[in-house]
From Swiss-Prot:
NCBIfam families: lexA. This is LexA repressor. The lineage of its organism: Bacteria, Bacillati, Bacillota, Bacilli, Bacillales. Residues 28-48 bind DNA. Coiled coil: none annotated. It comes from Shouchella clausii (strain KSM-K16).
Length: 208
């Protein structure tokens, strides 16, 4: 077994701890913050050496794709995890009054492969309470499949005529489009037209 430096031991221990606690590995930034390394290139260098020594395996095409191999675990603690895919979290969108859409990638959300089966899937953080009767609450992350069409009753992410994004239930009426909140105290948004950015296919919530 190749000997590890103290820093490599710290990094490997942190990765193992995060995988055990969360079920997925930390990002390069998180690793750097945990062990006191400000340079991401330095972290990448240590990860490359851990990989060369057989402790981890990385997929350079995917974010956070660090797999701790059996060599990196004690025999009595090694448990094979279901592989996960990481979809981008591209900002916040309101479930109340429409707000301007944010399309910068802020983070990556791990999902089991069977839930992230589409390349054009992303996540948005919900702000507001207009969808609470559909089980979508303030602070939830909705999983969105990018598409440009929707059926009546679908929950969608819509871009309004004022270039503002909102999550609502979609209804195409005879002469207008109705974006219906799932909150009986709120009124629908009535539009002549809107751009459908995607369909909500799931909700991710962290229980504190």
């Amino acid at each position: 077994m190749s000997k590890l430096s103290k820093r490599q031991e710290e990094i490997l221990a942190y990765i193992k701890d995060e995988v055990k606690k969360k079920g997925y590995p930390p990002s390069v930034r998180e690793i750097g913050e945990a062990v006191g390394l400000a340079s991401s290139s330095t972290v990448h260098g240590h990860l490359a050496r851990l990989e060369k020594k057989g402790y981890i395996r990385r997929d350079p095409t995917k974010p956070r794709a660090i797999e701790v191999l059996s060599l990196g675990f004690d025999n009595d603690t090694f448990v094979k995890k279901e592989t996960a895919s990481f979809i981008p979290v591209i900002g916040k969108v309101t479930a109340g009054v429409p707000i301007t859409a944010v399309e910068n990638v802020e983070d990556y959300l791990p999902l089991p492969d069977h839930l992230a089966a589409y390349d054009n899937t992303y996540a948005l953080v919900i702000q507001g309470e207009s969808m609470i009767e559909a089980g979508i609450y303030d602070g939830d992350q909705v999983i969105v499949r990018q598409q440009q069409t929707a059926d009546n009753g679908d929950i969608i992410v819509a871009m309004t005529e004022d270039n503002e994004a909102t999550v609502k239930r979609f209804f195409r009426e005879k002469d207008y489009i109705r974006l219906q909140p799932e909150n009986s105290s709120m009124e629908p948004i009535i539009l002549e037209n809107c751009t459908i950015l995607g369909k909500v296919i799931g909700v991710f919530r962290t229980i504190h």
